[in-house]
Amino acid sequence: MSVFEIVFSPTGGTEKVSCLVAGALDKNTVTVDLTDSGLDFHEVSMTKDDVAVISVPAYAGRVPAVVVDRLNMVHGNGARAVLVCVYGNRAFEDTLVELEDVAKRAGFRVVAAVSAIAEHSVARQFAAGRPDAQDAAQLAEFAQQIQQKLLAEDASEPSIPGNRPYKQAGSHRMAPEATEDCVFCGACAAACPVCAIEKGDPKRTAGEACISCMRCIAVCPRGARKLDPNKLSAVSQMLSKVCVVRKECELFI
């Protein structure tokens, strides 16, 4: 049995959670990076004896569309799947049920699901420092329960919260822009999951292609990519009404 860690983590928060879950199941995992636009996902294939921890962020309560497209290329071949949804302390809404449907279409058997919290990718002040020690302890406990289910060869499906049809996907995108501090190193263009930044001129961003994942901000070595401060302020004000109270990780098994 191999444990695959299939993860989409533009700013690193989802990866932290994913590692806590997958690493507790097996210290030697096979990583599939869904942010890698150069990877041929048709070549990703598992067997029925394998386990896949599929970890994605919630974008306005949905699975990012690019994740759906790339998971549709993967061959689950009956492998058992543990679904992980990570959100910035607002809500994950229909993300897990959508991920369940996508995983099943790709040939996985869903045996467990986890929702967890990480620092908000846009307004970083919300859920700052998470996953923290309390989250890590809780996720380790979840992983132990999942491991017991796997060892018992219990393939029963969990009851996962969410709605079908899913909520409408968010349409308001915010594309970060390069500031005067940009030195044209190209790190942002190389890392963009959807190739929305021109490699020859990283100050040019295709707004219609950008998915507002904030990866370019996260990888810029000079902090030279920023969101429009007025738009960021508006988002922060909106989130302040729903992100103040700490939300906890949940296990669905």
What are these regions (language model features)?
Residues 2-36, 42-173, 230-236, 240-253:
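FMN-binding flavodoxin-like domain, especially the glycine-rich phosphate-binding loop
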Residues 91-92, 181, 209:
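Charged, low-complexity surface patches
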Residues 159-162, 170-180, 184-185, 189-190:
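Reductase modules of NAD(P)H-dependent flavoproteins
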Residues 178, 186-211, 215-232:
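Iron-sulfur cluster-binding cysteine motifs and their immediate structural context
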